[in-house]
Amino acid sequence: METPETRFCKESKVVKTSRVFPLDTNNHNTLFGGKLMSYIDDIASISAARHCRRETVTASMDSVDFLKPIGQKDSVCLESYVTWVGTSSMEVFVKVIKEHLMTGERELAATSFLTFVALDSNGKPVPVPRVVPETEEEIMLHNTAVQRANERKNRKRHSQALANALGTDKPW
């Protein structure tokens, strides 16, 4: 197996800005959490594909932390990039910033980490390029990624044990 090349975090960077419309909101007039999660998975998948230039699958939405509500008078700006890689897996970080469109005030509204796996034409995992951080933020996220990777492995073990204990009988 050939050793993959190296890419900078910025080469996988994607930015997406959307306006919050009434149909995107819940009974609190804030953006539906599920809608934001869909935006997060979408933008993160583009970062993963840009990094490895292959088909990818979402292996895990590792964390989504909702920090501030996003209202109808806000736009929502998502920024994503690959922060760390395993052999065939990639950790993608997504930062969500809300901007009040009347005042211009910007606040960090959410953060998320996702894991993607690169696939070959047969749907099998394939090695991905190494990733090199450059900015302070990228370096900090890269340096703390091994801890998150270990937490993912532990969580996956616990999830598998839970899945083995659950039944699949019809609930009705």
Swiss-Prot record:
GO terms for molecular function: long-chain fatty acyl-CoA hydrolase activity. It comes from the Bacteria. Pfam families: 4HBT. InterPro entries: Cytosol_ACT, HOTDOG_ACOT, HotDog_dom_sf, Thioestr_dom. GO terms for cellular component: cytoplasm; cytosol. Keywords: Hydrolase. Residues 10-122 form the HotDog ACOT-type domain. PROSITE patterns: HOTDOG_ACOT (PS51770). Coiled coil: none annotated. The keyword 4Fe-4S does not apply. GO terms for biological process: acyl-CoA metabolic process; fatty acid catabolic process. Residues 148-172 are annotated as: Disordered. Signal peptide: none annotated. Its EC number is 3.1.2.-. Belongs to the acyl coenzyme A hydrolase family. This is Uncharacterized acyl-CoA thioester hydrolase YkhA. It comes from Bacillus subtilis (strain 168). The lineage of its organism: Bacteria, Bacillati, Bacillota, Bacilli, Bacillales. The gene is ykhA.
